[in-house]
Curated annotation (Swiss-Prot):
Gene transcribed to yield this protein: erpA
Subunit structure comment from the entry: Homodimer.
Cofactor note text: Binds 1 iron-sulfur cluster per subunit.
UniProt record similarity statement: Belongs to the HesB/IscA family.
Region (Disordered): 1-20
Keyword line: Iron, Iron-sulfur, Metal-binding
Protein name: Putative iron-sulfur cluster insertion protein ErpA
Organism of derivation: Nitrosospira multiformis (strain ATCC 25196 / NCIMB 11849 / C 71)
Amino acid sequence: MNTPFNDGSGQTDPMTDIPTPLIFTDNAANKVRELIEEEGNNDLKLRVFVAGGGCSGFKYGFTFDELISEDDTVMEKNGVKLLVDAMSFQYLAGAEIDYQENAEGAQFIIKNPGAASTCGCGSSFSV
């Protein structure tokens, strides 16, 4: 399907006036770009996925991928492509993918309003 989605602005799609379903922040896109530059492979894209497991039933995952699958939703922000497979996308609708650095460390964070509960570390959730 390779459907484009939110530009990360948190705004509505001007063509449909429907809220954008996924937000990819500037902080996250810029950090991914840094990591891709460190790897020296401009074909890399960030894949975000949901898998069974974790203390709350589902867990988030991040990996680099060179290939775009037929059922992926593809988003580009600041020159970085984000991939989400169709199954994972249904659990990530309305979520924000961000990167934060603080006194506790640095990490990618998913703020998911569709999650009924999350674990303390924020890496797993339930619906």
